[in-house]
Amino acid sequence: MEHKEVVLLLLLFLKSGQGEPLDDYVNTQGASLFSVTKKQLRAGSIEECAAKCEEEKEFTCRAFQYHSKEQQCVIMAENRKSSIIIRMRDVVLFEKKVYLSECKTGNGKNYRGTMSKTKNGITCQKWSSTSPHRPRFSPATHPSEGLEENYCRNPDNDAQGPWCYTTDPEHRYDYCDIPECEEACMHCSGENYDGKISKTMSGLECQAWDSQSPHAHGYIPSKFPNKNLKKNYCRNPDGEPRPWCFTTDPNKRWELCDIPRCTTPPPSSGPTYQCLKGTGENYRGNVAVTVSGHTCQRWSAQTPQTHNRTPENFPCKNLDENYCRNPDGEKAPWCYTTNSQVRWEYCKIPSCGSSPVSTEQLDPTAPPELTPVVQDCYHGDGQSYRGTSSTTTTGKKCQSWSSMTPHWHQKTPENYPDAGLTMNYCRNPDADKGPWCFTTDPSVRWEYCNLKKCSGTEGSVVAPPPVVQLPNVETPSEEDCMFGNGKGYRGKRATTVTGTPCQEWAAQEPHRHSIFTPQTNPRAGLEKNYCRNPDGDEGGPWCYTTNPRKHYDYCDVPQCASSSFDCGKPQVEPKKCPGRVVGGCVANAHSWPWQVSLRTRFGTHFCGGTLISPEWVLTAAHCLEKSPRPSSYKVILGAHQEVNLEPHVQEIEVSRLFLEPTRADIALLKLSSPAVITDKVIPACLPSPNYVVAGRTECFITGWGETQGTFGAGLLKEAQLPVIENKVCNRYEFLNGRVKSTELCAGHLAGGTDSCQGDSGGPLVCFEKDKYILQGVTSWGLGCARPNKPGVYVRVSRFVTWIEGVMRNN
């Protein structure tokens, strides 16, 4: 069984001024290599381990791994190109970039890739061989030139680039066709451009990707870890014809950059397919009809649709004829259509080797489900967990079990048919300590999931808990339990999960250690031999053990029970249906407990709203246009059915209305009496001021609005929608510049899912770490669930200061 890691606080080791050597490495948390040629050494830090790798003389060190708690360094001759990556707990794998790269910089003097054929297709002779050609350059005469195997190299600094002696007796040597690295130039559309150009075509300075000034945006580096959004360098994260950036000019949001094209052929993009695999970016079949039966327009044509997805702008995307393709990272192949009324549509491409996943058929007439009042949790070690959580303890999105990107692995549905490896849901296929998943972050191979163990009663229908008011900030109780990952735990447990006594933190027997001691971590509570979590390990409190053969282990410290209901944490797990309020699904009853039905004084539902505190509801300003009098409105809380209201529903009058002073489509309602917070009525959390939701974040809308003939009318429905970055949403083919910076877009561009009339004012919530945060108020759209016309929502974070001021002063 493979082992796994927990997130390491690398900042503990990356001291200022000492991190430069590590810039030459790619690091992956929670990963190890099957290595044959290796050395195991002791090192006090990651930098010390890197130095040992650089100093190694007996073999070429291409990678090393560092165990933080054990202070163990393993240097290795292999890397991911010659070995298999596995998961391992408490390990970070560092691989030298130069040995992973298959491109050259300049004349390729430092090229260390594995190309072993010349540009004329002749196999290279081994550098250590003397047949058929006696070499002038060999590993013995030039030991620092990387003359391994028969790989192309440039030991003599030849201006024409890497070369090799050939296995053809008639040709002593030949040059190799190594593509240029995308540092000074770009291949294709610059999706992999890695250079440092930071000015636009017109000479404007680029805004840093991690800055929200002068332009707020959703391309947040931590949310797009595979897009290399460094500093203010030009990049192409969204399928434009070439790299671009946001500018430092407040009057110019973004502009393309002038990156020259590389003169060498681009690297191979991998195998191509005649069927649909993944999102179809490598589909090269001949389907030329959309899902609605429209004929595709030729990519080189500009009639009837004018566009910039041309063969010239996307030279590597094989935009031949009018065949369906995916040149810009959409969710599936598509094309512009020859119907002037339909700009573009997705295509129906047969899947490679598997039938489409069937979706659950939902009964629109079914009564509200009697769902247990429980949080999503797991029993035992979680091998039986079959929930839909897909977020790790640090908030990272899980990689699909059937995907090999960004992490190649063997934990597939085919290899583990009984493990429930569906979509990207958290699972425990290998009997680990709890559910986990591979992450979509290339630098973090896997993490445990943001789930808690079920208590004795969770998982079965239980009586509703007592009614309580909203909590103040939680403080640890005297009970021996922990909050979160237990970094603040100061209890007196001193045995591991296996019952082994802990070694005292100040002791050096049986295990020597220097990083986690009372002297180095005086505020971490490292007293006696008590379980602690000084490094914020997401696995929870741990200790060095008194077993000489077991360096450290985790402790079994339970989570503290919350004494009240926290904002954004429903007591019923939402369904989170992946389907396309039009085209969504009926929600689990009371799984969105902040949902408000805004009604006329006669009881007619006409808008949605969101409970944000016991006395306050947030809604859209346009919902209040018919009357400025609070007495015209009332709110319904805790409802699942629109008409036949359940007995527990709370009906409260509105005492005051507050419209946003700059006329944004957002308003506050003060209730005549505070709502009673129960398991069915819980506020949503507000975001941080000016927080920007990253593009492609999956969020949820809910409401009773118009369903346009789809199922579930009269019951609360939900739909999952991706946020669309405003830059994309404002493209000509979508909303054509209509979306303001105080608004956000969300929706499926193919249509079929949207909020409609009657959903106005309702919530768009996004899951962040362990709770749902209100990021949007349903505002407007061009039609309802139309293709290419996503819904528009007021960006709540831009108005948090106003919201809090109104609530505080009234």
Curated annotation (Swiss-Prot):
Domain PAN: 20-98
Positions of the record's site feature: Interacts with fibrin: 134, 136
Residue positions of the active site: 622, 665, 760
GO BP terms: blood coagulation; fibrinolysis; proteolysis; tissue remodeling
Location of region: Disordered: 126-145
Location of the Peptidase S1 domain: 581-808
Modified residues (Phosphoserine): 597, 688
Keywords tagged on the record: Blood coagulation, Disulfide bond, Fibrinolysis, Glycoprotein, Hemostasis, Hydrolase, Kringle, Phosphoprotein, Protease, Repeat, Secreted, Serine protease, Signal, Tissue remodeling, Zymogen
Regulation of this protein's activity per its record: Converted into plasmin by plasminogen activators, both plasminogen and its activator being bound to fibrin. Activated with catalytic amounts of streptokinase.
One CC-aspect GO term: extracellular space
Signal peptide residues on this chain, from the entry's feature table: 1-19
Record: residues binding L-lysine: 136, 158, 172, 432, 445
All residue ranges annotated as the Kringle domain in the record: 103-181, 184-262, 275-352, 377-454, 481-560
Modification after translation, per record: In the presence of the inhibitor, the activation involves only cleavage after Arg-580, yielding two chains held together by two disulfide bonds. In the absence of the inhibitor, the activation involves additionally the removal of the activation peptide.
Domain notes: Kringle domains mediate interaction with CSPG4.
PANTHER family the UniProt entry points to: LIPOPROTEIN(A), PLASMINOGEN-RELATED
Note in the entry: Plasmin is inactivated by alpha-2-antiplasmin immediately after dissociation from the clot.
Complexes and interactors: Interacts with CSPG4 and AMOT. Interacts (via the Kringle domains) with HRG; the interaction tethers PLG to the cell surface and enhances its activation. Interacts (via Kringle 4 domain) with ADA; the interaction stimulates PLG activation when in complex with DPP4. Angiostatin: Interacts with ATP5F1A; the interaction inhibits most of the angiogenic effects of angiostatin.
Protein's recorded name: Plasminogen
